[in-house]
Amino acid sequence: MLHKIGIMGALILGLAMPAAAECLIEKDSIAGIKLGQNLKQVKQKFPKAKMERESDPEGVAYVAITLSKDVMVITHQDGDDDPDAPIKLHKKIDSLETYSPACHTASGVHPGMKIKDAEAKLGKVKKIIMSEIEAREYAIFTRHPKHFEFRMEMGAGIYSGKGGVPNQTRRYRKGGSILEISVSKYGGFDN
């Protein structure tokens, strides 16, 4: 009898404890951080989050928010272009991105996933576009979800070399994978 009470107590306690936070990538949020929120609201929702001012190799400013050892979300704020400026807690977030493999879309697509595996969930690659300035590669799938961008690892696309800029292709390297997934108030590659 005591054995059954112990098991029942453990089950009840388990249900009362909060589940581990899931890092879901949706059209307007990543890991519960929403487009349009400001960083003060994010800090209130995630008091243990670590926020750091960073910049990419091109000098674009962003704030990296570390939610756990497995989850980091990069936020861009409208008009926040100075990587040396202090973090602006009241500016709204207009773009979110993550490189964290623990984060995934509702269909299970995540950073680090092979392009071939993503095709099983999003349809065949319709095209891969290489951006003109940074030479970043983005895949567009036949069932591409609106507002999402899927950035490929560098060198994933196989280009003919004859096209104009930006280069476009449907071919990719066998081991090519998704580097990052982002959502933005400006939308993504919806075509």
Give the positions of each predicted feature.
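Sec-dependent N-terminal signal peptides
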Residues: I5-L15
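Internal interaction segment
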Residues: H147-R151
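Short helix/turn-capping signatures at newly exposed starts of structured segments
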Residues: A19-A135, F141-H144, Y159-N191
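N-terminal secretory signal peptides that target proteins for export/translocation
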Residues: M1-L2
